[in-house]
Amino acid sequence: MSLVPIVVEQTNRGERSYDIFSRLLKDRIVFLGEEINDTTASLVIAQLLFLEAEDPDKDIWLYINSPGGSITAGFAIYDTMQYIKPDVVTLCVGMAASMAAFLLAAGAKGKRFALPNSEIMIHQPLGGMQGQATDIKIHAERILKLRDKLDKILAENTGQPIEKIKADTERDFFMDAEDAKAYGIIDEVLIRNKR
């Protein structure tokens, strides 16, 4: 069971209560705080599209605390971030691992942040398959293509050579916030709120 806090605001027309995520959305904050799957991606994408419709010229903040997850769901979020007009500011609060680190690096250049005690981890895609040898081969070839695509985009977003990305993602590669800044995944470690 997931508990979602409710906040109450006083207005000149009385009280209004919101779940906390709806209240954050009013401030153009989208919170990705769980594993990335199709459901999570649909929710994040819907919020990004809604905020673009509300004001296409105002930045959207994507707060990330996620262990990563599905590559295809992550690509759906990534493509939407690139598609919409507003800049998407990314901020790691806690952990951005795997696909979540990929999304962190995909924020607007100069607007990718992490809090001081955040942890970022990149690695190659994970997959599992059982079945006939031909099917296993098809899936293995697919995951290798996905790895190449992820590595290419991560190299573009970080400024690292593709060979370094491939070597570093061979196994789990952990970074603290300062390391992630030096690597090019983020642009700045935030101590105080920039908003």
Swiss-Prot record:
SUPFAM superfamilies xrefs: ClpP/crotonase
GO terms for cellular component: cytoplasm; endopeptidase Clp complex
Active site: 98, 123
Function: Cleaves peptides in various proteins in a process that requires ATP hydrolysis. Has a chymotrypsin-like activity. Plays a major role in the degradation of misfolded proteins.
Listed GO biological process terms: protein quality control for misfolded or incompletely synthesized proteins
Catalytic activity reported: Hydrolysis of proteins to small peptides in the presence of ATP and magnesium. alpha-casein is the usual test substrate. In the absence of ATP, only oligopeptides shorter than five residues are hydrolyzed (such as succinyl-Leu-Tyr-|-NHMec, and Leu-Tyr-Leu-|-Tyr-Trp, in which cleavage of the -Tyr-|-Leu- and -Tyr-|-Trp bonds also occurs)
Signal peptide from the UniProt entry: none
InterPro entries: ClpP, ClpP/crotonase-like_dom_sf, ClpP/TepA, ClpP_His_AS, ClpP_Ser_AS
TM region(s), chain numbering: none
Compartments reported by the entry: Cytoplasm
EC number: 3.4.21.92
Chief place of localization: cytoplasm
Sorted UniProt keywords: Cytoplasm, Hydrolase, Protease, Serine protease
HAMAP family reported for this sequence: ClpP (MF_00444)
Gene3D superfamilies, per the entry: 2-enoyl-CoA Hydratase, Chain A, domain 1
Enzyme superclass (EC): hydrolase
Family note: Belongs to the peptidase S14 family.
GO molecular function: ATP-dependent peptidase activity; ATPase binding; serine-type endopeptidase activity
Pfam annotation, one family: CLP_protease
Protein name: ATP-dependent Clp protease proteolytic subunit
Subunit note: Fourteen ClpP subunits assemble into 2 heptameric rings which stack back to back to give a disk-like structure with a central cavity, resembling the structure of eukaryotic proteasomes.
